[in-house]
Amino acid sequence: MNEINVTLPDGSQRPLPAGASIFDLAASIGAGLAKAAIAGKIDGNLVDLNTPLADGARVEIITEKSPEALEIIRHSTSHLMAQAVKALFPQAKVTIGPAIETGFYYDFDVDHPFTPEDLEKIEEKMRELAKADLKIERKELTSADAIALFKGMGENYKVELIEDLGADKVSLYSQGDFVDLCRGPHLPKTSFIKAFKLTSIAGAYWRGDEKRPMLQRVYGTAFGDKKELEAYLARIEEAKKRDHRKLGRELDLFSFNDEVGAGLVIWHPKGAMLRTILEDFERKEHLKRGYDIVLGPQILKTELWQRSGHYENYRENMYFTTVDEQSYGVKPMNCLAHMMIYRSQLRSYRDLPLRYFELGTVHRHERAGVLHGLLRVRGFTQDDAHILCTPEQLDAEIKGVIQFVTEVMGIFGFEFEMELSTRPEKSIGSDDAWELATNALLNALKDSGRPYEINEGDGAFYGPKIDIKLRDALDRRWQCATIQCDFTLPERFDLTYVDADGEKKRPVMVHRVILGAIERFIGVLIEHFAGNFPTWLAPVQATIVTVTDNQIPYAQAAFDKLRAAGIRVQKDFRNEKLGFKIREAQLQKIPYMLVVGDKEVESGMLAPRFRDGKNLESMTPEQFVSFIESEVKSYK
């Protein structure tokens, strides 16, 4: 065959010489496209730019403006970094280096930890290698040949990866004298890498196993141009200012203490108040939507966890104890007690759906290396609910949860994205049950009218799920809400209801959280608002500030009125300058400062000032109460 035909995204066909590559296709369309092309898609699969085309293939050309481009750029930049490290530190052993949502990383086994000065040297070497315009080439070897190659190079981590793959052939990428094991695709040349920055260093165990060697993980990011990179780095600097761990200390919200234990939060008065506000909000919103509030025990017999499948699939993340020679598991999830409530009496189809809601505290054994402030802890409280319904009610219930999420996230000012995660390799339940559950979730997503993605193989072991990822003020994604469909646990615990025909049927269970872990959500809120909580959420809504000691009696009376009316108010009657006291209240990010001087005492008023410095009209204490109540009612 001397000629082939390929189909372009618009449906048109284009003839090419046999053996033509994606680059040749781009060049045949135009010189500008050939210059902009970095990779391609053949029949939906990402491939390198020089990949040969087959007759009848559906082809798409990837440029820096394509949605897929950033991952390719970042993956190639991680290889460039590994090449630079090997050039500067020849004894370093390379392991893995994927692209991630915020950039990329690469793990190295080195004799000494990298320093900030080392990162500067690595970056400089990367720039040198990028300018060298090295060709990035893909080749396939048999696994035996690839193992021999990497053994000869002393790269035993790569040998282990190839052995674990168990494939007949593997693909390698080379650029200059650097060779790496990789599926690809990659950029055509190192000169295509134009804008990057190494951002941090961390420790990471090989394959996440604490019994394996500790490696040095170097994080970085890369973009198509320097303008995008600079904008991202500016967001990173802003994120550092908003870091919930930093603000948590400054605002006296929470702390951690090694004497207490890693990953266990100690809530201070202001933090506990913030938590209480959220929990009260949750209870009110759930009651409005027909949920029943329930509460289960902290420990349950190990036999129950064995019956549920948690012991088999999740026990490495659980804590166990023995009481009176009986083994118990500290709950990592709230579902089992809810099933016991359902089983406590005979259920009719007329009773369904039942919606059990619990602000349940759970404990999970997270590895020390992954703990991160409030975002990853070992003890946390979930706004956990389980809906038990008939199969016919399932679609409506899932749609109801998606609507619930939409309304709640609107109150907090979050946009969100949805992702359907399907059956993982390690799972329980029949094929039919998984198919039914997956289709129910998919139908609800389609009917929601919102965009969604499908994440193959990332569902929970007991059912498919919808993950809902919030977008914060810095355009970061946070996974909080989850909707999981479960046909398995009702069967394991023999949950039934009597149908209209008098026969016993199996209910469907939906596990769902709206905010997710309260701790994690508070961490996200702190960073989203930079600690400047809206009035309805603020642990302290106002502080009364006196000008001199002469105003203390009136200010105290006003304080008592506000507090009695339910306003979260504090006072600052110290013998300090007014400017000092106002500045301190601003640093504590309190929404309103109520200044009391001689004029306010004489008029029976307060002089409100917003934390940004804007002065409001004077108000009586009663007027200020109404003002705050109005803000709280409208979630301002």
From Swiss-Prot:
Compartments where found: Cytoplasm
Signal peptide: none
Enzyme class, UniProt record, top EC level: ligase
TGS domain residues: 1-63
CDD domains registered for this protein in UniProt: TGS_ThrRS (cd01667), ThrRS_anticodon (cd00860), ThrRS_core (cd00771)
Molecular function (Gene Ontology), one example: threonine-tRNA ligase activity
Keywords from the UniProt entry: Aminoacyl-tRNA synthetase, ATP-binding, Cytoplasm, Ligase, Metal-binding, Nucleotide-binding, Protein biosynthesis, RNA-binding, tRNA-binding, Zinc
Pfam family, one: tRNA_SAD
NCBIfam families: thrS (TIGR00418)
Main function: Catalyzes the attachment of threonine to tRNA(Thr) in a two-step reaction: L-threonine is first activated by ATP to form Thr-AMP and then transferred to the acceptor end of tRNA(Thr). Also edits incorrectly charged L-seryl-tRNA(Thr).
Protein family according to the UniProt entry: Belongs to the class-II aminoacyl-tRNA synthetase family.
The protein, known as: Threonine--tRNA ligase
Organism: Citrifermentans bemidjiense (strain ATCC BAA-1014 / DSM 16622 / JCM 12645 / Bem)
